[in-house]
């Protein structure tokens, strides 16, 4: 099972998201082809209601602790309640390019 599949499986089980997008962004960095080191996760879940943004991130870090310690170098998290997601027009945030790309 790929790292991306593991991330998706764990998040689905823990948060039952209304929307989930996991993007492998390793190709945007100095990573080898097929690498799974940099990910962007957009998670929309009612579980995030009444939880501060820092605490939301902490819950994801705790859930993916093993992967963060062994495989994942960078994890961009965009975490929303269904209401917050609707307020931002259900738009997936764009990622910035790695500062080292093209040097």
Curated annotation (Swiss-Prot):
The UniProt record lists the keyword Membrane: no
Key words, A-Z: DNA-binding, Stress response, Transcription, Transcription regulation
GO BP annotations listed: DNA-templated transcription
Matches recorded under InterPro entries: BolA (IPR002634), BolA-like_sf (IPR036065), BolA/IbaG_stress_morph_reg (IPR050961)
One Gene Ontology term, aspect cellular component: cytosol
Claim: Transcription regulation is one of the keywords in the record: yes
An MF annotation (GO) of this entry: DNA binding
Recorded family membership: Belongs to the BolA/IbaG family.
Function text: Transcriptional regulator that plays an important role in general stress response.
Protein name (database record): DNA-binding transcriptional regulator BolA
Species of provenance: Haemophilus influenzae (strain ATCC 51907 / DSM 11121 / KW20 / Rd)
